[in-house]
Each structure stands twice: as structure tokens, then as C-alpha cells.
């Protein structure tokens, strides 16, 4: 099924609505989060496992928007995410955390944190995760909390 709140943009081309994945046996779970991918399943993974389409060596940005009311003060964001193979988080295009690049790139096993106390704007904001796929299935799962004071 599609997750209409999350969009994707592939570095190699293509944009659209993210697809909710079945859980890959190696993927860690995150309370309240679902793994998403960029494509409906159309490869051998579908018949064997049904958990996503491979996109070898591609970078995929997954984004979700949120709105801060006019006059919002002291906005902050904290959260955790998993990415296959690794990922970086961004608030309105500015980096806010991510996985270190390692030879194994096990971002689907080890979570990364994101946090921001600045970079918010009144109105529309965008939280994005740029995921690097080193081969095979890829995706992202995230859970964030956004707080602010509204006078």
C-alpha cells in the first residue's frame, strides 16, 4: 500500500508516493514507524520475499511535510531512524543527523538520531531522509517528535 504522507525522489530519476514495505528479516522495528520504499514490488524479491525492489547504488530522498503555525516559538525536533543501507536526515534542506559511512553500512540494524532546535520556518516545513542503497532492497523507517510553543 502507499503512504500518502511520504514522497520520494530518486537521484537516478523519478518521484512519487512511498510504498509501505513488508518487513525484511534483517530490518529492525521502530515503534510507530513503518518501513517505506520507492516502488511497487516488481522483481524476484516479490515472489521470494515480497519486501521491496532493489535499486543498486541509488540515493533516494524520502520526505514528509509538516506545518508550524505563525508565531510558533522554541520549535524542536528529535527522532530516530533506520535506513538501508545508510541515511542522513534533513530539516528544510539542512543536515540534522545520520549514519556514519562504514564498509558494512548497517543502517537497517543500527539506528541514527536526528535533532534540530533551529531551521524551522512558519508554515510549511520538510523533514527528509536521504538514503543510500549499496545494493539489494532499500528503505527507511523513522519516528520523530516535533514540539513548539504557540502563543
Residue ranges and their predicted role:
Residues 92, 110-112, 142:
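Surface-exposed beta-strand edges and their flanking turn/coil or helix-capping segments
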Residues 86-98:
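Short, surface-exposed beta-strand/strand-loop-strand elements in extracellular ectodomains
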Residues 43-61, 99-109:
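Extracellular beta-rich ligand/substrate-recognition surface
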Amino acid at each position: 500500500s502507499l503512504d500518502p504522507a511520504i514522497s520520494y525522489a530518486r537521484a537516478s530519476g523519478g518521484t512519487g508516493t512511498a510504498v509501505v514495505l513488508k518487513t525484511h528479516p534483517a530490518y529492525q522495528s521502530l515503534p510507530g514507524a513503518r518501513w517505506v520504499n520507492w516502488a511497487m514490488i516488481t522483481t524476484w524479491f516479490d515472489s521470494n520475499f515480497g519486501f521491496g525492489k532493489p535499486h543498486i547504488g541509488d540515493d533516494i530522498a524520502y520526505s514528509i511535510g509538516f506545518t508550524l503555525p505563525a508565531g510558533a516559538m522554541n520549535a524542536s525536533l528529535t527522532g530516530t531512524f533506520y535506513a538501508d543501507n545508510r541515511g542522513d536526515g534533513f530539516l528544510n534542506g539542512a543536515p540534522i543527523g545520520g549514519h556514519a559511512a562504514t564498509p558494512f553500512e548497517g543502517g537497517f540494524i543500527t539506528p541514527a538520531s536526528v535533532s534540530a532546535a533551529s531551521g524551522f520556518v512558519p508554515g510549511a516545513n520538510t523533514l527528509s531522509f536521504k538514503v543510500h542503497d549499496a545494493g539489494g532492497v532499500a528503505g527507511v523507517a523513522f519516528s520523530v517528535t516535533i514540539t513548539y510553543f504557540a502563543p
